[in-house]
Swiss-Prot record:
Protein name: tRNA N6-adenosine threonylcarbamoyltransferase
Class of enzymatic activity (EC top level): transferase
Documented EC number(s): 2.3.1.234
Domain of life: Bacteria
Residue positions binding Fe cation: H114, H118, D301
GO MF annotation terms: iron ion binding; N(6)-L-threonylcarbamoyladenine synthase activity
UniProt xrefs under SUPFAM superfamilies: Actin-like ATPase domain
Originating species: Streptococcus pneumoniae serotype 19F (strain G54)
């Protein structure tokens, strides 16, 4: 049987990434060009800056991904691309490159939901058994997703306001930490103590919804009031207290979801899945189901995860036409 190679593109936010997946399960390359340094001084991603960076490096990323995989353009069997959710300008760069490559070589174009990519990155650890439940935690999303089979996703719970990663960045900015703040907060946690009583919104309510705006506001108010009084607060203790509240919320809702949906596997994915505190809590408290977390290199935005997610779409022959457009607000229930 002839080998099949998927060339995947991911440009939904501030990472330009191109990857090659061989025979559905062997990731040969996963090139990522990060823009973090360009956005640090703004304290967040500037859409126009992100789009321009994508344009500047996308061709080099394609060439590097093919070279690292040891294949040529003629060896590629299909092209996969993120078409949402994300920043519209950033998405369009990846879409344009992917469609141009597919059209030039007469290849099928596979549309992939960015969040499905995060979820299916777990396939790199071991073959997934369905049905399963997934906790997706990133800068833009906090969702509990029930997956009955590969490619069949149903959101059963989500945030009503801020995403968890967004909350990390906002409190990090208040403390003067560098963007993105998640990693630094996670490191400072282990040097501090949980001494500030921050709210755990909706933690006792009988639903699978999340809310982090109250926690964020309480944190900002505490910090602001201390500054007004000339008081000094321990950054380490603030981080420890904030993260303890976040983890209590995530764990409570995840446990409730596992009670409602009795599955054998829990996937935890997205940029925040790299958090040490979250991994420690999962290992200690979720012991009756298998917990699968992608390796650190596949937690952030990358094209490797898009390649993994595209396999089920290819098997269903869910190909896109040349009119495929960016859908910045794409949800699981509105996929192509």
């Amino acid at each position: 049987m002839k080998d099949r190679y998927i060339l995947a593109f991911e440009t939904s936010c501030d990472e330009t990434s191109v990857a090659v997946l061989k025979n559905d399960d062997e990731l040969l390359s996963n090139v990522i060009a990060s823009q973090i340094e360009s956005h640090k001084r703004f304290g967040g991603v500037v859409p126009e800056v992100a789009s321009r960076h994508h344009v500047e490096v996308i061709t080099a990323c394609i060439e590097e991904a093919l070279a690292e995989a040891g294949i040529t353009e003629e060896d590629v069997t299909a092209v996969a691309v993120t078409y949402g959710p994300g920043l519209v300008g950033a998405l369009l760069v990846g879409l344009s490159a992917a469609k141009a490559f597919a059209w030039a070589h007469g290849l099928p174009l596979i549309p992939v939901n960015h969040m499905a990519g995060h979820l299916m990155a777990a396939q790199s650890v071991e073959p997934l058994e369905f049905p399963l439940l997934a906790l997706l935690v990133s800068g833009g999303h906090t969702e509990l997703v029930y997956v009955s089979e590969a490619g069949d996703y149903k959101i059963v719970g989500e945030t009503r306001d801020d995403a968890v990663g967004e909350a990390y960045d906002k409190v990090g900015r208040v403390m003067g930490l560098t963007y993105p703040a998640g990693r630094e907060i996670d490191e400072l946690v282990h040097q501090g103590q949980d001494i500030y009583d921050f709210p755990r919104a909706m933690i006792k309510e009988d639903n699978l919804e999340f809310s982090f705006s109250g926690l964020k506001s309480a944190f900002i108010n505490l910090h602001h009031n201390a500054e007004q009084k000339g008081e000094s607060l321990s950054t380490e203790d603030l981080c420890a207290s904030f993260q303890a509240a976040v983890m209590d919320i995530l764990m409570a809702k995840t446990k409730k979801a596992l009670e409602k949906y009795p599955v054998k596997t829990l996937v935890v994915a997205g940029g925040v899945a790299a958090n040490k505190g979250l991994r420690e809590r999962l290992a200690a408290e979720i012991t009756d189901v298998k917990v699968i977390i992608p390796p650190l290199r596949l937690c952030g935005d990358n094209a490797g995860m898009i390649a993994y997610a595209s396999v089920s779409e290819w098997n269903k022959e869910n190909f896109a036409g040349w009119d495929l457009n960016a859908k910045p607000s794409l949800a699981f229930d509105t996929m192509e």
